Amino acid sequence: MTKARKALENYRRVVIKIGSALLVDRRTGLKKSWLDALCADIAALRAKGVEVLVVSSGAIALGRTVLDLPAGALKLEESQAAAAVGQIVLARAWSESLSTHAIVAGQILLTLGDTEERRRYLNARATIGQLLKLGSVPIINENDTVATTEIRYGDNDRLAARVATMVGADLLVLLSDIDGLYTAPPHLDPNARFLETVAEITPEIEAMAGGAASELSRGGMRTKIDAGKIATTAGCAMIIASGKPDHPLAAIEAGARSSWFAPSGSPVTARKTWIAGQLLPAGSLSIDAGAETALRSGKSLLPAGVRQVTGSFSRGDTIAIIGASGREIARGLAGYDADEARQIAGKKSAEIAAILGYAGRTAMVHRDDLVMTAPSGARLVEESDEGKGKLHA
């Protein structure tokens, strides 16, 4: 896998995320001329053999304009009503703009469960794959008409990253009113440096993410870095670029300022990609330094190295693994229910049968079901022959 930046036309499958503020004017509604210019860019990429998917914000912003809702934060039911109206307007706009290039648009509305529950994830992936096979451009958005505050992606940056990993894209482009990553907010710090290339998302890079989003959108640099962690861990490069100019993709190709995030050099399997990208782990295991060293060496997580079990989860659920520093270092599929995990935490594997009353697995999380997510690891644990088929979702 190359760590060098390539021209957009040299990628195989590209996911493009559009921020609400780019697509919708608070006073006049849809920015039709801008959308037409973007669709011309998409058509140009497709003509060069690139498959393109779009994650488009804007349904709520369009709906609130049509419904003449007041400025400021909306109540949940107001947001859902605005989304119901706006989704129709948004889908029609994309369909009309793409049709001028003889491209068919296909609308897909996702909820959190469509990427977090394995069976629904596979079904959504199959549907998107079929649309691409038929030559369509999938236009994807969160289904805000049914999403609640507690059960939602919350922003389309992370949704776009999950879509990118779902479909095996090799590039994610986040277009917004931000032209890339700076060492500090440039409007607050005149000495802030622009980062053209990010080789790895380290804690220092994460600390550079600041800033709240605009009223029309829910995203910000924080969510873009989160999206980058999901995408790059799965081997997908990411670009953050300004979408303000007409023909924003052509502008990137022409050398406009943007930040490029290099993909992880590690190969990924579809199943492990799903594990790594889970947005809402069901619980967590806090481990000691010795266990962390073992995981980084490609070993399974044994009960002896577990210091604390948090949350309520079942065997096979995705859980976060917290290192000695207190930061998440990995994710994996639980080998035991939370109650059983608490009973055997800190114990030797040989004691499991006596404690639980049956001879369970020796590992709390098997290496075949484990993905390192910390920057210093940032890799997938290699699969072994031992235990293959166990805990496969």
UniProtKB/Swiss-Prot annotation:
ATP binds at residues 17, 176-177. It is an enzyme of class 2 (transferase). GO terms for biological process: L-proline biosynthetic process. The keyword Nucleotide-binding applies. One of its GO terms (molecular function) is ATP binding. Its EC number is 2.7.2.11. It is found in: Cytoplasm. The keyword ATP-binding applies. SUPFAM superfamilies: Carbamate kinase-like, PUA domain-like. Its main location: cytoplasm. Residues 282-359 form the PUA domain. It catalyses: L-glutamate + ATP = L-glutamyl 5-phosphate + ADP. It holds the Pfam family AA_kinase. Pathway: Amino-acid biosynthesis; L-proline biosynthesis; L-glutamate 5-semialdehyde from L-glutamate: step 1/2. Substrate binds at residues 57, 144, 156. One of its GO terms (cellular component) is cytosol. Keywords: Amino-acid biosynthesis, ATP-binding, Cytoplasm, Kinase, Nucleotide-binding, Proline biosynthesis, Transferase. It comes from the Bacteria. NCBIfam families: proB. Belongs to the glutamate 5-kinase family. Catalyzes the transfer of a phosphate group to glutamate to form L-glutamate 5-phosphate. This is Glutamate 5-kinase 1. It comes from Rhizobium meliloti (strain 1021). The gene is proB1.
